[in-house]
Swiss-Prot record:
Protein name: Arsenate reductase 1
Protein family (similarity comment): Belongs to the low molecular weight phosphotyrosine protein phosphatase family. Thioredoxin-coupled ArsC subfamily.
UniProt key word Iron: no
Localization in the cell: Cytoplasm
Length: 134
């Protein structure tokens, strides 16, 4: 029986940032963590997020866009908000749930280079967490 911790990445629409974070999380943390993502709303996975991750050989076509699940939120070991809106309106978490904010620009509707930059920034941040625990 696995006894993995759970990390829950949250953003507004579970469309871009949290989808990319889930993918990077599975790559860098998947051996020790259950990696999940959700949004305040579910906007569907942005095709450019799929394309951006494909560029780094990570396939997210099977990931789904989901709204925040209260049960997962209450049982997560770590909740990471990726945008100010999610940080501001995220439901309260119990005291035992560690919550941190790692803010990233919203690439939706932006130039392709913004998707690539945000993808790389999220990947680097999660890799740092995997290596240092911070």
């Amino acid at each position: 029986m696995e006894n993995k911790k759970t990390i829950y990445f949250l953003c507004t629409g579970n469309s871009c940032r949290s989808q990319m974070a889930e993918a990077w999380g599975k790559k860098y943390l998947g051996d020790k963590w259950n990696v999940l993502s959700a949004g305040i709303e579910a906007h569907g996975v942005n095709p450019n997020a799929i394309k951006a991750m494909k560029e780094v050989d990570i396939d997210i076509t099977d990931q789904t866009s989901d709204i925040i699940d209260r049960d997962i939120l209450d049982k997560a070991d770590l909740v990471v908000t990726l945008c100010g809106h999610a940080n501001d309106v995220c439901p309260t978490t119990p005291p035992h749930v560690k919550r941190v904010h790692w803010g990233f620009d919203d690439p939706a509707g932006q130039e392709w280079s913004v998707f690539q930059r945000v993808r790389d920034e999220i990947g680097a941040r999660i890799k740092k967490y995997a290596e240092t625990g911070e």
